[in-house]
Amino acid sequence: MKWFYFSATAALVGALGGCGGGGGGGGGGGGLPFPILPAATLGVTVQVNGSSATANGDGKYSIKPGDVVTVTPNLGSDWNSSSDPAGSVSLRNADISSTKWSAQIANNTNAASMFTVSAKATANAALTKDTVFNVAAGDARNLSYKVYATNGSQQTLALNFDTMSYVMTDETGLAVSDSFSADAAQTGTYVFKSSRNTAATNNSRFRLITDAVVGSFPFQVAQVPGSYAVQPFIGSRAIVTTQSALDGIYIRFGINMRPGLIDSQIRQVQVTGGGTSLLLCNEVAITSIAACPPTSIATYSISAGSSAGSWSTVNVANASDKGALAVIMVDGKKVYVAAGINSVAPNDSIFRIGLVDSSTWLNTTARGGDNNGTWGTLGFDATTYTAALTKPDGTVSNVSYGLNVASASIPALKGINFAGTDRYFAMQDGTLSVVVGARTNPVTGYLQIGLVP
């Protein structure tokens, strides 16, 4: 590990000796002896979260992830630190000088680890002092997720519940980090702090379920650098890497985006042949694969992509029409996802999400956000969709719309408010709910993702 060195000025200690002159046969007086100085030692005091700490019987200090540790030496010092296992401990908000070593401790693992802070006196390298900490296991929720965002990007979200902090890293490696906090008004929801949030109400939030995270974040507006808007995302740490496991029939919603324009897409798709083929029904009326006329079925080949869990698709009738998909696991259920740039002109940014088709429609209540920047509670029963959505300005929009049959061949696809002006489609699987605006109406391009508690 790299030492942190700091300059120091050595103190020079002098002693004066006296001499006497004899006269008349008198004797001379001897000089005073040089004083013997005690050997210097390097000592430290330790504080944890601002309070004095006492070492255990074995000379080590017990701390938990998220604690702020301060080590203060009695001599100006240079510093080094290490963890065992290597890399298991990271530091946040480090403040290191010749007179102090301070940082918040994060355990990057779900097991206990050891962390050592080593001081070496700047003026005398022979003087050293190790301060050893037993660091408790990190929170089991300290995980990283592959994120598929509705602005058409793929990112990585790392959450640390010990330090209540996050890092969101985009495809270029640009990382933004800050803190998050529990939402006191909605158990199980957490609020992202971000300098990108400028609205009166912060609707950048997330919720967790087994292997997955669903939320909203101030991502860059698609293809508009420097502009940000709160938009939904879904992330998973369980991505299907076995090709045959991709197989399934999915109801798939999507949006296409470029500056000033946004469109919706609603399709049923089927991955078949042990994950080697993707079938898509291109009928104007939304139609199941089973009921789709053969001339309206587009077939794509599927092969392994550039990274584990990414699968490349190529239209067998048009090699320039290609893309990528992934299947992620959310609480044990398969979810089809895609985010990126369309290879076909005009090269829209695209987002796709698909749930496994089912003959069952469930009564559910979810929490989630939409690409209007709202966050709220979303309810479905046999006949009605309801939502209480908090807008960025803090006002609440309450809606209650009737559900409609959207496709005779796809029972799990529902229409919302087909008798009204703002018309939507909905799907759900008991864990996720997704709503998309219908094409050619005022809410075209709308997308909402909710997670059932």
Enumerate the predicted regions with their spans.
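C-terminal edge beta-strand
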Residues: K129-A137
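A short beta-strand segment in extracellular, disulfide-stabilized domains
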Residues: N56, S62-P73
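C-terminal motif of bacterial Sec signal peptides marking the signal peptidase cleavage site
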Residues: A15-G18
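Extracellular/luminal low-complexity segments enriched in Ser/Thr/Pro
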Residues: V71, D95-N110
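Mature soluble binding/inhibitory domains
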Residues: G20-P33, A136-P453
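Exposed beta-strand face motif in extracellular beta-rich ectodomains
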Residues: N110-V117, D422-R423
